[in-house]
Amino acid sequence: MTRQILFTLLALGVVFGRGADALDAADDLELRDGDRIVLLGNTLIERAQIYGYLETMLTIGNPGLGLTFRNVGWSADNVFGHSRAVFDAAAKGFGKLRKQVADAKPTVLIIGYGSNAAYDGEAGLPAFVAGYKRLLDALAGTGVRMALLSPVRLEKMKPPLPDPAQQNENLTLYTAAIAGIAEERKLLFVDLFRHLRADSPEERLTSNGIHLNASGYLKAGQLIAARIGAGGKAAALAIDAGKPGVVSAKGLQVDELEKKGETITFKVLRGSLPSFSAAGGAEQVLQVAGLRSGEYVLRVDGVEVAKADSSQWKAGVHVGGGPDYERIEKIRKLAIEKNFFYFHRYRPANWPYIYGFRRHEQGNNAVEIPLFDPLIAEKEAAIASLRVPVARAYELARVKGGAK
């Protein structure tokens, strides 16, 4: 953090206890059974609902918790709720924001503001900080636990799009302000601006330099989920084919291990479904020692997921794909469908005809809006039925004609 930024923030009454660089190392937010996690913010939050990565990660990372999610993000919104005013005066947006959050019944709030506010530069920072504190004060009375997200860094695109360097300097200032507010109030802060980076110069995390694409939301979800109880749950299994027997197992249970000729079969029950990764999710490692020289194929519930020679199996092979990953994708698609229904539940199209000044023209359309509720409940029940892992049948077999 530069001295100028620090001086500006201190002048605004933002207090740092451990230094801004250490703020996102604060204690993680622990989820509880039955938590309702509500995402609140601007375009960064609203667009998350069409990808579903974060809530899928939190769901599969906590299979024993009955988590549910609501997205009340609103494009171009700010900490004052101005965009939510719609046809009313901008000042009325804050009251609507509070009602939308209250209607969602959160126990946990993940809040993402600041990206559009940063266009006001340093001059707009006092109003932003004051507005953010006012928002948190209004929400804190419910006893909800909160996590604050920074804005994301703008990507440099090809001309004629402008160089984002100056705006990224502004975003640095606003990120530091949010970090300071989180420190002051002992809230979890996740620094997406600093940590959300592409793996290579060719990779793009946005569609236009500003708004995250699928890869961007996947990686952002990983960063957030790692701080909210869904990180670091890789599984590993080591087997000695000579006995046969289990040498070690992490994050899973093994049963019915048998060896018949050149084939080893066993059942695996994971503690949680695999996590997403940028490489497609291959975070389970299987080591098998004592195999006769040759090539072996691994099938899970009859689906081929890996092939390697005996020396590679001895060293350890990363296993990805298969039924568990299909299960995760089903959960993600169900989350997206549920989000679609909830969006139209709390924010229906043709608002003036349903609740506004033209509602008398077409009768009582508002009575139909609660009909979204059973559709939402149906999707959540389907997610609940999939989030807990089931035992899988593994088969490691030597390929005919493999190396002798």
Descriptions of predicted regions:
Residues 21-75, 90, 97-105, 109, ...:
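Serine-esterase "nucleophile elbow" of acetyl-processing enzymes
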Residues 72, 146-153, 168-203, 218-237, ...:
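Extracellular serine-dependent O-acyl
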